């Protein structure tokens, strides 16, 4: 039996097309994936992300433990509510998961992990926490709703209490605050402004309905994928996994090499990979007809005249730009043009940094 989120009946009420997503019954779309995509870029849409797992890490050694566990450094987080993104690596520097960590106090951090990696993540964290004065608590009683788009914050404000609106006023990106029963964070997976709201399951249906009543449109996994790809955001299991190091997944910016004496898990292996050189994740743009798809081979000739090959990790038609975009892992020697093999023909593509759309506009 597939797992169902607390909002399952709300999806059925809205005539969602449900699909299995890593063991969860989730909405693919509510009619038109393209319309859902545009509503997030132009107005406000919401996603049920209750399949993701909230984990609270508490105790006297919570900071020390997370500085060991994560490649990014939680010691950088000084202001309560501030969050950072980064990888949890294995000893070979493979990415076990990418996750967001919120600093709530010196003895309380909150991690949000991907649904596809939940069991693996929790097993790894439980193993690594041995010997630390730390308690790891999964919070299955919490649901999560992401409200995203240029009008998302204004429409959410109509639903929040006065206290909650005061709490989020002026909040910068990548912060979270507990106000009343809601944990409201300025994070997302779309490249738009908005909130990810963690809500007790008992209140989730009422919050979803209140957002609906205020003109926020429900959006499914289909639009979520095209939006995150336009924003150049990785999808775990597709753009990276344990066989991929973070430098080859456009996550180099999330690795805190300083201070040198912080021995995070995977550091030694990653330093060796960095010294030897590794592949990189790039963006591809194809203005010709056709759609770039996962797995298609990518070819280019390097500066020495040698043909090199990589592969697309995520590809789609971009509803915002009107042509196809992709992310691809390729040898580091790639220039600004390449070719993709589709239907036994090679088609030219532009190579850019993997970010295509930000705040509704072309980002390259």
UniProtKB/Swiss-Prot annotation:
One of its GO terms (molecular function) is aminomethyltransferase activity. It is an enzyme of class 2 (transferase). GO terms for biological process: glycine decarboxylation via glycine cleavage system. Keywords: Aminotransferase, Transferase. It comes from the Bacteria. It catalyses: N(6)-[(R)-S(8)-aminomethyldihydrolipoyl]-L-lysyl-[protein] + (6S)-5,6,7,8-tetrahydrofolate = N(6)-[(R)-dihydrolipoyl]-L-lysyl-[protein] + (6R)-5,10-methylene-5,6,7,8-tetrahydrofolate + NH4(+). Its EC number is 2.1.2.10. One of its GO terms (cellular component) is cytosol. The glycine cleavage system catalyzes the degradation of glycine. Belongs to the GcvT family. The glycine cleavage system is composed of four proteins: P, T, L and H. This is Aminomethyltransferase. It comes from Shewanella loihica (strain ATCC BAA-1088 / PV-4). The lineage of its organism: Bacteria, Pseudomonadati, Pseudomonadota, Gammaproteobacteria, Alteromonadales.
């Amino acid at each position: 039996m597939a797992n169902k989120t607390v909002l399952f009946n709300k999806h059925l009420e809205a005539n969602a097309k449900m699909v299995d997503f890593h063991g969860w019954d989730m909405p693919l779309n509510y009619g038109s994936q393209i319309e859902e995509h545009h509503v997030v870029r132009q107005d406000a849409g919401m996603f049920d992300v209750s399949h993701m797992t909230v984990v609270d890490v508490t105790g006297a050694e919570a900071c020390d433990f997370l500085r060991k566990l994560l490649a990014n450094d939680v010691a950088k987080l000084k202001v309560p509510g501030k969050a950072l993104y980064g990888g949890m690596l294995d000893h070979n520097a493979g990415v076990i998961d990418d996750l967001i960590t919120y600093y709530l106090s010196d003895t309380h951090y909150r991690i949000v992990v991907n649904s596809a990696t939940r069991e693996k993540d929790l097993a790894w964290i439980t193993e690594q926490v041995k010997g630390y004065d730390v308690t790891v608590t999964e919070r299955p009683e919490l649901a999560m709703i992401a409200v995203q788009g240029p009008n998302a914050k204004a429409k959410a404000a109509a639903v929040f209490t006065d206290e909650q609106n005061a709490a989020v006023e002026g909040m910068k990106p990548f912060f979270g605050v507990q106000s009343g029963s809601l944990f409201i964070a300025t994070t997302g997976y779309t490249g738009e402004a908005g909130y990810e709201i963690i809500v007790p399951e008992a209140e989730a249906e009422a919050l979803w309905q209140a957002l609906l009543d205020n003109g926020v449109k429900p959006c499914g996994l289909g639009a979520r994928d095209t939006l995150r790809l336009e924003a150049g955001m990785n999808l775990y299991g597709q753009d990276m996994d344990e066989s991929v190091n973070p430098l080859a997944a456009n996550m180099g910016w999330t690795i805190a090499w300083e201070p040198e004496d912080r021995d995070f898990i995977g550091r030694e292996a990653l330093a060796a990979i960095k010294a030897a050189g590794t592949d990189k994740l790039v963006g591809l743009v194809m203005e010709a007809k056709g759609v770039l798809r996962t797995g298609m081979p990518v070819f280019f000739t390097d500066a020495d005249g040698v043909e090199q090959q990589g592969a697309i990790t995520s590809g789609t038609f971009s509803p915002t730009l009107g042509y196809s975009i992709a992310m691809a892992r390729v040898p580091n020697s790639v220039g600004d043009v390449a070719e993709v093999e589709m239907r036994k023909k090679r088609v030219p593509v532009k190579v850019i940094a993997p970010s295509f759309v930000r705040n509704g506009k072309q980002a390259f």
